[in-house]
Amino acid sequence: METPIKIVAGRSNPELAKKIAAYLGTPLCDAKAENFSDGEISVNYFESIRGSDMFIIQSTNPPADNLMELLIMIDAAKRSSAYRITAVLPYYGYARQDRKDKPRVAITAKLVANLLTQAGADRILTMDLHAPQIQGFFDIPFDHLYSSVVLIDHVKNMDIADNLVVASPDVGGVKLARKFASELGTELVIVDKRRPKANVAEVMNIIGDVKGKNVLLVDDMIDTAGTIVNAAKAIKEAGGLKIYAAATHPILSGPAIERINTSVFEKVIVTDSLVSEHDFCSKIETVTISNLFGEAIKRIYDGESVSYLFDSKNISQKITNHH
């Protein structure tokens, strides 16, 4: 008997879950998560999931409730005899706390890995981890997708590739920016910033030439937008022409929207890994990653290679030809 597939939506990003289910041609599993009056979370599956291959879709931002809800959904699935449970985290929260960067602090990324595994996840599927080595915090299969294949495709269709350079807003993002530069056939520029204290970014010097060029700043996330907006300002002052940004995760906390609205950016391209308030910002454009996740889930379910999806040529063919 064939193992049935079940796609479950947590409350963090129901729209993305719907799109993924539509890509797979399967309805969302009949399930409900709700809060009791004291704030405790209750999860209920209203259909049999015994023996099913389950994919629970939940980004963990804001972290506390969404992570707890995901753990409870996994626990309920395990106790209902699901055959295999894959936790699908388009955005993996707490990934920035991946090591002890000062004395007497937690390694929360590892704690989250332990919690997911202990709750009963058999496999993890996520995208653009802030620190890729977090994969090693797990002793279960871990599939790590890259949004760059989707974002690069989008940039190629924007008619800005002429006279373009790709920039990293800090030294840590060079690897990601290099991938964009390589795929787009452009030079790479680095903005070397020093951060005096948490959530305060200070731009220093630009390594590379931006004078008279269009510039695409690339990052894995935009949180308060300080880093990327300051980098754009520095590039503009150094003679950059039109400035764009591409980032995977639109956390957009605190003053982010206001900063982007008043920034020198022409456009800021993000994915729908998170639901955010960017409707209030005309500069932000969203590209869906639903087909990328849909294809990855299909491949995991069918026992096929997921690394096939790391190549943008495969992605373009696969997910744009899919109806």
Swiss-Prot record:
Q: Which top EC class is named for this enzyme in its record? A: transferase
Q: In which pathway does it act?
A: Metabolic intermediate biosynthesis; 5-phospho-alpha-D-ribose 1-diphosphate biosynthesis; 5-phospho-alpha-D-ribose 1-diphosphate from D-ribose 5-phosphate (route I): step 1/1
The positions annotated for binding ATP are 38-40, 96-97
| The keyword Mitochondrion appears for this protein | no
Q: Any note on cofactor binding?
A: Binds 2 Mg(2+) ions per subunit.
Catalyses: D-ribose 5-phosphate + ATP = 5-phospho-alpha-D-ribose 1-diphosphate + AMP + H(+)
Q: What Gene Ontology cellular-component terms does the record carry?
A: cytoplasm; ribose phosphate diphosphokinase complex
Any one GO MF term held by the record is: ribose phosphate diphosphokinase activity
Principal location listed in the UniProt entry: cytoplasm
User: Sorted alphabetically, which keywords does the UniProt record give?
Assistant: ATP-binding, Cytoplasm, Kinase, Magnesium, Metal-binding, Nucleotide biosynthesis, Nucleotide-binding, Transferase
- Top-level taxon of the source organism: Bacteria
InterPro entries attached to this UniProt entry: PRib_PP_synth_CS, Pribosyltran_N, PRibTrfase_dom, PRTase-like, Rib-P_diPkinase, Rib-P_diPkinase_bac
Kindly list the biological process annotations in GO that this record carries: 5-phosphoribose 1-diphosphate biosynthetic process; purine nucleotide biosynthetic process; ribonucleoside monophosphate biosynthetic process
The UniProt annotation places Mg(2+) 1 binding at 130
Report any Pfam family annotated for this entry.
Pribosyltran_N
Compartment(s) of residence: Cytoplasm
Query: What is annotated about its quaternary structure and interactions?
Result: Homohexamer.
Q: Give the protein name, as stated in the record.
A: Ribose-phosphate pyrophosphokinase
UniProt lists the gene as prs
